[in-house]
C-alpha cells in the first residue's frame, strides 16, 4: 500500500513539474494564464450547467424568447466583466424594477429630509423663544418678586388672628 502511495505522489510531482516547466518557457501563456483560466472556467461551467439552467429558466419565464433574451444578456454581461467593464446590460423588466426601487429610495430620502427640516425649524423656534425669555428689557419691571412676596406674606399669616387690633383701654 505504501508503494502505491509513493507511486501516486511521484506521478503527481512529475506532472506538476512538467506543467510548470512548460509554462516557464512559454511566456505568453504564463502572462495571460489567469485570464485564460477564468475563460475556461466560465466555459466549462456554462457547458455543464447549460441544459438544466435552460430548463429551469424556460419553466420560470414561460416563453422561449424571454429565455434566449436572458441568456444572451447574461453572456454579454459576463464578456464585458471579463474585459474589465463596470457597466452591464439590463433587460426591460429589471430596468423597471430598478427604476421603481430608485424612486422608492428617493421618496424615503425626501421624507427623512422633511422630518429633519421640521425638527430643525422647531429647534430654531424654541431657541428664539428661550432667547426672548432670557433677554432683559429695561422698560419692563419684573413683578414676580413682589407677587411672590405678597403670596408668601398671605400664606405665613395666621388665619385665626384678627385683622385689626382692638384696644381695650
From Swiss-Prot:
SUPFAM superfamilies per the record?
Answer: Rotavirus nonstructural proteins
What UniProt notes about the protein's domains is: Binds 1 calcium ion per tetramer.
Gene3D superfamilies per UniProt? 1.20.5.430
Assembly and partners are described as: Homotetramer. Interacts with the immature particle in the viroplasm. Interacts with host CAV1, early and late in infection. Interacts with host integrin ITGA1/ITGB1 heterodimer. Interacts with host integrin ITGA2/ITGB1 heterodimer. Interaction with microtubules blocks trafficking to the Golgi apparatus.
- What is the name listed in the Swiss-Prot or TrEMBL entry for this protein? Non-structural glycoprotein 4
A Gene Ontology annotation in the biological process aspect, one of them, is:
monoatomic ion transmembrane transport
State the compartments where it is located: Host rough endoplasmic reticulum membrane; Host membrane, Host caveola; Secreted
Any one GO CC term of this protein is: host caveola
Principal location: host cell
Query: Which Gene Ontology MF annotations are present?
Result: channel activity; metal ion binding; toxin activity
Recorded topology in the membrane: Single-pass type III membrane protein
Task: List the stretches on the Lumenal face of the membrane.
Answer: 1-28
Cytoplasmic topological domain ranges are: 52-169
Q: Which family does it belong to?
A: Belongs to the rotavirus NSP4 family.
Binding-site positions, Ca(2+)? 120, 123
Q: What keywords tag this UniProt record?
A: Activation of host autophagy by virus, Calcium, Enterotoxin, Glycoprotein, Host endoplasmic reticulum, Host membrane, Host-virus interaction, Ion channel, Ion transport, Membrane, Metal-binding, Secreted, Signal-anchor, Toxin, Transmembrane, Transmembrane helix, Transport, Viral ion channel, Virulence
The record lists the membrane-crossing segments as 29-51
PTM comment for this protein? The N-glycosyl content is primarily Man(9)GlcNAc, with a small amount of Man(8)GlcNAc.
Q: Which residues are glycosylated?
A: 8
